[in-house]
């Protein structure tokens, strides 16, 4: 079981400021997490392939297709801000970047 001093030490190392309520709650929560990790370490994983994902990921989006849009002026007319034939967007990089 993790004690209060260990919680305070870990919080200090992680640069966390804990409230007294959090300090009282964390020993049991951290102990439960460590108990679970210990259970996991007892599992036989010799025949389990290493993976970075629990489930297979597949791309379910459609293939990109280039299409021409007939009325570019209609798009520009509905833009909140524009300059000539271009959309104006807020600057996202500062002067030094």
UniProtKB/Swiss-Prot annotation:
GO molecular function: asparaginyl-tRNA synthase (glutamine-hydrolyzing) activity; ATP binding; glutaminyl-tRNA synthase (glutamine-hydrolyzing) activity
Gene (UniProt): gatC
GO biological process annotation, one example: glutaminyl-tRNAGln biosynthesis via transamidation
Protein name in UniProt: Aspartyl/glutamyl-tRNA(Asn/Gln) amidotransferase subunit C
Job description of the protein: Allows the formation of correctly charged Asn-tRNA(Asn) or Gln-tRNA(Gln) through the transamidation of misacylated Asp-tRNA(Asn) or Glu-tRNA(Gln) in organisms which lack either or both of asparaginyl-tRNA or glutaminyl-tRNA synthetases. The reaction takes place in the presence of glutamine and ATP through an activated phospho-Asp-tRNA(Asn) or phospho-Glu-tRNA(Gln).
Family note: Belongs to the GatC family.
InterPro entries given in the database record: Asp/Glu-ADT_sf_sub_c, GatC
Keyword hit for ATP-binding: yes
Keyword Protein biosynthesis tagged: yes
Native source organism of the sequence: Picosynechococcus sp. (strain ATCC 27264 / PCC 7002 / PR-6) (Agmenellum quadruplicatum)
EC number: 6.3.5.-
Catalyzed reactions: L-glutamyl-tRNA(Gln) + L-glutamine + ATP + H2O = L-glutaminyl-tRNA(Gln) + L-glutamate + ADP + phosphate + H(+); L-aspartyl-tRNA(Asn) + L-glutamine + ATP + H2O = L-asparaginyl-tRNA(Asn) + L-glutamate + ADP + phosphate + 2 H(+)
Keyword annotations from UniProtKB, A to Z: ATP-binding, Ligase, Nucleotide-binding, Protein biosynthesis
Enzyme class, spelled out: ligase
Any one Pfam family match given in the protein's UniProt record, by short name: GatC
Oligomer status and interactors: Heterotrimer of A, B and C subunits.
């Amino acid at each position: 079981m993790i004690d209060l001093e260990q919680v305070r030490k870990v919080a200090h190392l992680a640069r966390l400021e804990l409230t007294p309520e959090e300090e009282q709650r964390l020993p049991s929560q951290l102990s439960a997490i460590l108990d679970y990790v210990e259970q996991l370490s007892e599992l036989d994983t010799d025949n389990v392939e290493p993976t970075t994902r629990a489930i297979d990921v597949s791309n379910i989006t459609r293939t990109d297709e280039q299409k021409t849009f007939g009325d570019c002026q209609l798009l520009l007319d509905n833009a909140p801000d524009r300059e000539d034939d271009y959309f104006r967007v807020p600057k996202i990089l500062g002067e030094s970047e």
